[in-house]
Each structure stands twice: as structure tokens, then as C-alpha cells.
């Protein structure tokens, strides 16, 4: 099995897009990239927009290779919509390239879903149904694909129990020699997802941390995230790739320091420098204006 992290906050955009080659199958997980439209009251800096285009180009390249596409939920950093979006670098052509002729395993569009995501799922399916090879609603189901098993969790909260952001599905890929779980946007904040991960006992866990950058709206999420991920590490001894929401917080290295086994970011797994652009948006705007500011990465 070969696991290739594609795009994430440590690579400069909002995403957790991943490509997996297993048993002759080529699987693209959560094919979306986006930028936060506002952070510190500021729009994306120029370097963020440039990086978004680079990540879109990379995502489309891997989409052309994929046989299977999985979608954990309908936020635009996890799937590419069929409209032209500046901060999603999206278009109908990009979407068609990703989904046409592919087998799609997707979060159920009408069950365990909030109003916003239900609307997005409807818009997605209105376009995708005509071009996909096959579409399966994946929640809680398992698929045997000739030596490779792809298993999906039941719908679990997007974050803490009772979250207004809706639900997501996690995916396990097992080729008989390695078990990989991609646990998108669980934020390590609900017991259902933690129990499912421990029960499935992965060799590698790819997940997003808590949204500690939200400040008072995320009170207690740091402690809960550390506790839950440490439990997963101790129970499974999985290698962990941790990225996404937590890397929007400049303090994310301190979060990593509190874990029983230090995870890698997407950038770290790829052996390149972390470039958490959104976390340093204030500094990036100052640099672009010629004002004095420093960031802990190369521009």
C-alpha cells in the first residue's frame, strides 16, 4: 500500500485530501482544497492564493489517476463543487475531471446531515449522478473490492457530540497487509469516533485535530483532543498523521508535544517544510505590504 498526502494546512491550504494505492486500486479521499475567506479579519494573502492554485493542480493530477473517490462530508475543503469558487479554486471542469467515470463512495446525502450540507449534497448529486460510473452511500457499509476492503464508519459528529456542523464518515482501507484510517473532521472530540478507530486498530491514522484556533468557541477542545488521541495511540500504537484544524493554530507544535507519540503533519510525512500559511495570515499581509514581520518558514 502507498499513501500520499496531497493537501492540508501544513501544506498551505484547508484540506485533508489523500491518495492511496492498494491492491491495484487508486483511491482519492476527500478531493477538495479551500482557503478560509476571513482570518484575523483578513482575506487570504497572495501567497495563500498562489498555493491554492498549486494544490488544485496537484489534486487534479491525482484525480486523473483515481478509480475510486470517497467523500466524508460536503464541506468544500473536502469535496470539489461544480461551481466556480475563488477560495475553493473550483469549477465545473475540475469537478467533472474528478468524478466522471469514477466509483464514488459518499456520505449519505439525506440521513444524519444538517441543512447546509444537505443542500450541498443535493447540488453535488444533481451533477455527479450523470457522470459517475457508480455512486454508493457509504455510511456504516463495507465493500470488498478484490483483495482490498474499504469500510466506512457510521456517521459521527463533525467535532463534539451535538455539533451544529453535522456529521462525517471515516474510511478504513485494508489490503491485507496494512490498515489505514482516514478520519476526517472528527476533530478528536467525540467518543463514537475514538471507539471506532480503536476497534478497527489501524496501522496508520490520518486525522484532523481540534479547532483550537477558534478561541472561546473551542474551550476545552485542546485537552479533550490530547486525551482522546493519546488513548488511540496507547490502544493501537498506530502511526499518526495529524493536520487540518489544529494546524490553523500557531501553537500546534505544543499540542504535538503533549502526545504519547509525536505525529507527523502532511508536510512532515512528505519530508518537506511545514507552511501553515493561514495561521500566519497577519504576518503574510504585513510582509506583502513591505512591513516588518517574520514567519517560521520559507516563502
From Swiss-Prot:
Coiled coil: none annotated. It comes from the Archaea. It holds the Pfam family Lactamase_B_2. GO terms for molecular function: hydrolase activity. Belongs to the UPF0282 family. This is UPF0282 protein TK1681.
Amino acid at each position: 500500500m502507498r499513501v500520499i498526502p496531497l493537501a492540508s494546512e501544513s501544506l498551505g491550504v484547508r484540506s485533508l485530501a489523500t491518495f492511496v494505492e492498494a491492491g491495484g486500486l487508486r483511491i482519492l479521499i476527500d478531493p477538495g482544497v479551500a482557503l478560509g475567506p476571513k482570518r484575523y479579519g483578513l482575506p487570504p494573502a497572495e501567497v495563500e492564493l498562489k498555493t491554492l492554485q498549486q494544490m488544485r493542480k496537484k489534486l487534479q493530477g491525482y484525480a486523473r489517476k483515481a478509480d475510486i473517490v470517497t467523500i466524508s462530508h460536503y464541506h468544500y475543503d473536502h469535496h470539489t463543487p461544480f461551481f466556480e469558487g475563488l477560495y475553493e479554486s473550483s469549477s465545473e471542469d475540475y469537478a467533472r475531471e474528478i468524478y466522471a467515470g469514477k466509483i464514488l463512495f459518499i456520505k449519505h446525502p439525506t440521513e444524519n446531515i444538517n441543512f447546509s450540507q444537505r443542500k450541498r449534497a443535493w447540488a453535488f448529486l444533481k451533477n455527479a449522478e450523470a457522470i459517475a460510473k457508480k455512486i454508493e452511500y457509504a455510511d456504516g457499509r463495507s465493500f470488498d473490492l478484490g483483495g482490498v476492503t474499504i469500510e466506512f464508519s457510521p456517521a459521527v459528529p463533525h467535532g463534539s457530540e451535538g455539533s451544529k456542523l453535522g456529521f462525517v464518515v471515516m474510511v478504513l482501507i485494508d489490503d491485507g497487509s496494512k490498515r489505514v484510517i482516514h478520519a476526517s473532521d472528527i476533530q478528536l472530540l467525540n467518543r463514537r469516533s475514538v471507539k471506532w478507530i480503536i476497534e478497527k486498530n489501524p496501522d496508520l491514522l490520518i486525522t484532523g485535530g481540534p479547532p483550537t484556533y477558534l478561541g472561546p468557541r473551542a474551550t476545552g477542545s485542546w485537552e479533550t483532543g490530547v486525551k482522546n488521541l493519546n488513548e488511540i495511540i496507547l490502544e493501537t500504537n498506530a502511526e499518526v498523521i495529524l493536520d487540518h484544524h489544529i494546524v490553523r493554530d500557531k501553537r500546534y507544535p505544543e499540542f504535538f508535544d503533549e502526545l504519547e507519540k509525536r505525529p507527523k503533519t502532511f508536510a512532515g510525512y512528505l519530508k518537506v517544510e511545514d507552511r501553515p500559511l493561514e495561521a500566519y495570515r497577519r504576518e503574510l499581509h504585513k510582509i506583502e505590504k513591505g512591513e516588518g514581520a517574520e514567519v517560521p518558514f520559507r516563502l
